[in-house]
Amino acid sequence: AIDDNRFDQMFKLAEMWQAEEVKLNISNAEMRPRILPNQDIKVMVKWPTDATRMIESFMVATNACVGNMLGKAGAPLPWRCHAPPDTAEVLELNAKLAALGVDIELPMPSFKTHGQSDSDELSDLLGAWANTTIAPIPTVKPPINEANDVAPYLANVLDPKARQDILDSLMDAQSKASSLANKTRRVVDQGLFHLMQRANYSHKNLGHFGLNLDAYAHFTSPIRRYPDLMAHRQLKSMIRGEDWVYDEAETADIAEHCSNQSVIAKYIEWELVANAYHIHLLRGGEVDSTSQNTYPPIMEKSWPARIVSLRTPWVYLDLNDDGAIQGRMHLRQMDSKQRLNIDENGLEVTSAEPGRDGEHRVVARLGEKYPCRLRGIDIWGGSLDLAPR
């Protein structure tokens, strides 16, 4: 399609939309193992291309357009919702960055909704903290008129300005991280990635933080996702002036069911992809290559890995330091003779007992290179089992 001039206008329009977008730039490689008929395994790593970005732009625009159209009409929908970062996780990342001496501090997320005053937001927060309902703080409010009304389907959506402020702060952190040394930059990138919540379906529209949209409903894939089929049926009802096919109660039940099933399906996909790739590695295969259906002894091989996360009792490593392949190493693999600890900020692996000098020996630090080798695969966890080189 890139070389076909029939698509020139579509590419230009998509590029214009992309230039105007205000959203996080988080692109991860997609691992694509293929099990061939003779049981050989072919593995490729796919990154976004101009063509896939163009298609994604049109799909997102279509989903948002249909969501707003049906939302204004009052149609019950299984909205695709994505929440902003969790306050506790922002605090944890800030503490980690401060301990690393990185001059990046993320502000606490705001949870102000469309049309909500600052005092009402404060009341909601205080009520949530106290696990009770607190009467709104009295304020002088302007008279409500048609211009100030908030459409019912947007009542629970994060205020666009509040959402914009959070996104701006995260993008600013990304920009600052790009000028840091590799060791620190990867830590910041990984931390920002893990701030992102998992999207889900809900009968209440909560907006889509990652896409920076007030309303988002899956519509473009009715042959493989039931929520898309629901949106198609509701749209037909609107066009024909008929009653909604799905009412609010049924939509709520289906949205919850689809969310649960999508999580299960995603975990199964991750495990299958991971295990196929790990078997490929055990056969001595590489990325963008085919491994034979034989099992010769693995030759001693190591990767120039980088430590990207420390969470007791695991050390997570990026094998090629490019974000494509990750595995994990148990603390016991780093030193079988003594017990090791990870500090509260997830910055260092140290000896649990002090040495003769009274100091705790530092075994490894977050962001450091740590060459490793493959021990095997954790079939149930779907992860590479690593050991020091």
Where are these regions (language model features)?
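Electropositive polyanion-binding surfaces
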Residues: 1-346, 367-370, 376-388
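C-terminal structured domains
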Residues: 349, 353-369
